[in-house]
Swiss-Prot record:
InterPro entries: UDG_fam1, Ura-DNA_Glyclase_AS, Uracil-DNA_glycosylase-like, Uracil-DNA_glycosylase-like_sf. GO terms for biological process: base-excision repair, AP site formation via deaminated base removal. PROSITE patterns: U_DNA_GLYCOSYLASE. Belongs to the uracil-DNA glycosylase (UDG) superfamily. UNG family. It is found in: Cytoplasm. The active site is at residue 64. Keywords: Cytoplasm, DNA damage, DNA repair, Hydrolase. HAMAP family: UDG (MF_00148). Its EC number is 3.2.2.27. Excises uracil residues from the DNA which can arise as a result of misincorporation of dUMP residues by DNA polymerase or due to deamination of cytosine. GO terms for molecular function: uracil DNA N-glycosylase activity. This is Uracil-DNA glycosylase. GO terms for cellular component: cytoplasm.
Amino acid sequence: MATELTWHDVLADEKQQPYFINTLHTVAGERQSGITVYPPQKDVFNAFRFTELGDVKVVILGQDPYHGPGQAHGLAFSVRPGIAPPPSLVNIYKELEASIPGFVRPAHGYLESWARQGVLLLNTVLTVRAGQAHSHASLGWETFTDKVISLINQHREGVVFLLWGSHAQKKGAIIDPQRHHILKAPHPSPLSAHRGFFGCNHFALTNQWLEQHGEKTIDWTPVLPAESE
C-alpha cells in the first residue's frame, strides 16, 4: 500500500546532518572555484523530484553521474534529450528489445517517463567532476543514498530492486528480501553485459511481479515529455 509520507518528511533530519551539509558545501565550493560539476545544481536531486517516496515501485541503482558534457541530469543511466545514449544504456535497450514484446529502441536516452511511473533511478553518488569518474566518491553522498535505500526498505513494501553489478549489490545488502523483490545481474556496461546482464529478463520479471501484486506495470519505452502530452 502506498505510503503518504514524502521524501521531505523522511529526509528532513538527514539533510541537517553535518556530513550532508559538508557534502553540499564541498560541491558548491568546487562549482564556485570554476570546476565543472555534473549534473547542474538544479538537477542534482531530480530522482526524488520525479519519483515521490509513496510512488516508488522499482529502484534501479547506478554509481555516479555521467561525466561528459550535457549528459547527466540527475536520473541514473538517463541522458538529456539530444545526447546519444551511452554504452550502458544502449545495452539496457538491447535487453529490453530481447525481453519486452514490441519494444522499439528509441534514438534518445531520456528516462524521465520511467521515473514518473515509479522507477527511482538512483545513483549512489549524486555529483561528479567533468571528465573524472568517481571524483566525488567518499564526499558523503554514499551515506545519504544508503539512508534513502533504508527508508524505502522501511516505509515501502513490495518494491522491485534491480541491482546490476557488485557495487549496486553491496549497496543493496541492507534490503529486506522478505519485504521486497530483489533481482541481481552483472552491470550493463560493455565490460560485463555479456556475463549475464543480457538475458537477465529483469524488465519482464519486474512487470510480472507488479502485475501479481496488483500494481500497474511499467511501460519501458522511454517517451520524451513532448511526445507524452
